[in-house]
């Protein structure tokens, strides 16, 4: 019969520090968005230059590789509910936005006008911000903020 009077080494308290004999190295890898309409979202982000695979608009999950190794992940609401049945879409105001650096101020204007002209919501028209950028805000099909910006002085 095992000795149950001693506590397993796994549960003994020890000095503060990493639990696995070395620092963990989590690193920023991806930005994930839950979308209500995959086709509309893929179309929107492709217009901004994101390289989603062919037929991505018909998939429950898709990814676009970003410069520098990051990825933009899109999942349908049904995909999230398949492993988290109680998941509810957030309510209230949006608290996060994607910020996209444009080549120059003219590109901020051009991209904003193209997407608004295609029927997407323009939240804040391009303007010369006091912090030294040409700046505009759009909403993706799910209402997520997408900021467009470029330095005013190159």
PLM features: residue spans?
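A short, acidic/glycine-rich surface segment
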Residues: 79-86, 124
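Low-acidity, Ser/Thr- and Arg-rich intrinsically disordered low-complexity segments
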Residues: 2-10
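Mid-chain, well-packed structural core segment of small domains
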Residues: 98-112
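Core segments of cupin and vicinal oxygen chelate
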Residues: 33-81
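Exposed loop/turn and edge beta-strand positions of beta-sandwich/beta-sheet ligand-binding modules
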Residues: 58, 94, 132
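Short connector loops at helix/strand junctions that flank enzyme active sites
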Residues: 67-69, 91-95
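Vicinal oxygen chelate
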Residues: 10-23, 63, 112-154
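N-terminal beta-strand motif that seeds the catalytic metal site of vicinal oxygen chelate
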Residues: 16-42, 95-100, 151-154
